[in-house]
Structures are given as C-alpha cells and as structure tokens.
C-alpha cells in the first residue's frame, strides 16, 4: 500500500518529465563585498615579499601615446622598454624560476593543438606547489574558504590548476589555449596579439628581440613596485594596441589578484586596491566549454587602465 501511495505521489512528475531526484544544494557562498575584496588586495600588496625592489627594474618609457595614436602601430620609441632587470636576484626566487620554466611550453599561434607532455605537467605542478607556499596564496585560500567558495585549501588548489591550465579551443578546432597561456604567455589570434599581460614574459620577449616596444599610454600612480602600465607593442609583425601589465610584481601576486577577481567577480570589472589607490581588474570566463560541475575556464584577466 505504501509503495502504491508513493508511486501516485510521484506520478505527476513522471508524466511531466520532471526530475524526481533531489534538487542540487543551493549556493551557500557568502557574497564577497567590494570592501572585502579591496582589503584582501591590499594584503596581497603588503605581503608581496618577492616583488622587485626599486632598483631591480629600470624602464625607459620614452613616448606617451595619446588615445588617437595607440592604434596606429607607429613606433614612437627608438629604444627598448626595459633598460635593466635584476635577473640574478629576481629569477632565482622560486616562484619566478617556476614561472620562467613554463613560458617555453606553448605554441603562441591559436589553431595549433597544445601538446602537454608529462614534463610540462610536472612544471605546472611545481609552479602551483611553489606559489601555494607563499603568504599571498595562503591569504587568498583562507578567504575563499571563509566565504564558502571552497571547502579546503586542497580543493582550491585543484580548481586553480584546472581554471588556469585546463585546455580549450579558441578556434572551434584543436585544444589550443588556456587561461595561463593567454594571460601569462600571450597568443597570436586573428592576426593580432591576444592576451600577454605578464611583465616577465614581456621582458623576455623583448630581450630575445621578438617584441618591439612602441609607446606607453598609461602609467599608474604607484611610486614603487608593483606598478601598472599600458603599452603598445609589436610581437613580430603583430600589433597590441593596448596591453596592461603589473610591473615588478611576483607571479603569486598576479595569480592571486586575477583569481580573486575571477572567482568573486567573473565577467565583470572588479574593484581592488593597492597602496590606498583603487583600480579595476577585468575578468572574462570561457563560455564555450566547461569542466567539473559546469565551471568555466579563465579566458582573460588584466588590469583595466
């Protein structure tokens, strides 16, 4: 009799095609306020012990382009952007060293499948392991756990690797891209530079003669590092009309700032703060493919100046 009664109760759902499974648990995450995000960004700024000191980087900005000049592709700078970078000091630091290891792993032209052999997977893991030793990533992890975004540091670590290093296609063809490749390495997509928002990569490209610095269009208000700039440049013959960068920051700082905004303010402008000055980071999710339970990969993230 009880079985018959239960069946009658469920019959309307079965007829209508509705699921009889329990509804998924509702999102229990506490919303992160703008004030909390800005406060945490300030903590990252104060805790970035691996950042460049004032004498570790010397820039030669040369010409400031107007808004009408940035898209012209004109070379207003006769000299290189980076006069000096203290590689012996900065690149010997573990998180920098692990980042540099990753930067030769990618085919920069979209449309070509990315091969990820075991050695490169090991380099990804080594980079993530290293940044998780820093106080910046610890602060980020603790914040996410306190807000219910993740249940543990281990679950956050697993998800961070997937959101940044998981492969997807930007060309409706082979798996040719990832959030990390786009933001930290840079790509050539549809005849233009796409992504490329990491200063270490920019420096190494210019040092090797692959990038030609053209001009700058924005200089942040900060006197020390990290600072924020917007540049115009060419990678081979391909143009970047406006590329924004943290300059002098550590790899863990960049990852933390971008991930904080990506998780809490996806596909939008995210207000953060450094040294008392507010600015915004733009994040984009990759909507054409997902991983896990409908999660989206990083498409892009950069300072919006």
From Swiss-Prot:
It is an enzyme of class 4 (lyase). Belongs to the ENDOU family. Endoribonuclease that cleaves single-stranded RNAs at 5' of uridylates and releases a product with a 2',3'-cyclic phosphate at the 3'-end. InterPro entries: ENDOU, EndoU-like, EndoU_C. The keyword Lyase applies. Its EC number is 4.6.1.-. This is Uridylate-specific endoribonuclease D. It comes from the Eukaryota.
